[in-house]
Amino acid sequence: MLNTLWEIREKVRDLSPLVVNLTNNVVTNFTANVLLAAGASPIMSEGVEEADDLVKIANAVVINIGTLHSRQVEYFKKAVYLANKYQKPLLLDPVGLGATTYRNETTFELLNSGNFTLIRGNYGEISFLAGNSAQVKGVDSQTSDFAAENLTEVAKRYKTVVVATGPVDYVIAEGELYLNRTGDIMLQKVTGTGCALTSLIGAFVGVIDEPALAALAALAFYGAASEKARKISAGPGSFLVNFIDSLYNLTKEEFLELTTEKVQGLR
């Protein structure tokens, strides 16, 4: 399996998929740099007027609700419609879902307005989507009692691939369940690493027709790069720089070493 995951990573570098990001203004720069380092081509867009032109040429479209406002929501709705119209992979990152009524209403409105290829969130966000309405304390909620059943519920309800990231990353789709245990805790010390991960998953989904396997490849690659970076970093500042470098220069040999016995397919 690990060799297959690396082949997907190489496809990203070879094909340089165009990822249209409708993301939040906290993470725009970091997300673009993550995509570039991995070999993808990012577009960071805020103007609904260019939606049709961009979605038409995209290999994937990523919606991130991190810094939510009404003008952005208008763009989100149009992007959902256009991605479905042009049959483009469409990903949702419901940042902070469960924290405010506005985020909750917007997320459910988007999910009910079209078909999403994949939803990625942390344990708290995915649990909320599944109907467990405990208050989410922040955008980095890592609820320790997360149950994999939450993914099954969300995947069935929205007919999509669901990715929940935390101490163990879960990927579920119909007939598929994967676990990933790569990743360093330093990722939690740099803002935007989850948001950038969703966009990176978009790049991987954009090069093969198996979104669950593509998501697993992105998770394993991202986590392995973070582990490599941590080894030569003194703290969050140097880690940030070293992480971008690791995404760029991680070798197959390093990937296989860092992912062995950390990636599983359960069915």
From Swiss-Prot:
Its cofactor is Mg(2+). Keywords: ATP-binding, Kinase, Magnesium, Metal-binding, Nucleotide-binding, Thiamine biosynthesis, Transferase. One of its GO terms (molecular function) is magnesium ion binding. Gene3D superfamilies: 3.40.1190.20. Catalyzes the phosphorylation of the hydroxyl group of 4-methyl-5-beta-hydroxyethylthiazole (THZ). Belongs to the Thz kinase family. This is Hydroxyethylthiazole kinase. It comes from Carboxydothermus hydrogenoformans (strain ATCC BAA-161 / DSM 6008 / Z-2901). The gene is thiM.
